[in-house]
């Protein structure tokens, strides 16, 4: 048991230590420009997305209190599914947000908030890459339902250089 834990820890250190690009949020994120609908191109496997087949979108709407309303939707075998949440700036780097999908009355609990870092962003906000400090989460998002294959490969390579396990990416949309 102990040798398994040591081996697992060594593997994680090696993965993160091998990163040649820093894993950190972008320094400039204009929430008004980021708002709107994004189409998911790819993501790391997550329990809460296990039933999503395709047509995965995230729509962000600015709210008066400086947060963003979040509406995630996807097509499942039984039709469309959706969930609503809130994203809030963390007060640190501009691209560092936290999201929650738990009810508002649970918002005071730290464990209902997840880190949502915009780690790469097209200057014209045509695509974005969202990750987390743990590298457990990774989404490649686009304003259009598909993405140029060359652009995706470049994004994937940079995510790998940041230490993300890109070999596990699940494709959610076609590449052009």
Predicted stretch roles:
Residues 2-3, 7-176:
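A beta-rich soluble binding module of mature secreted/lumenal proteins
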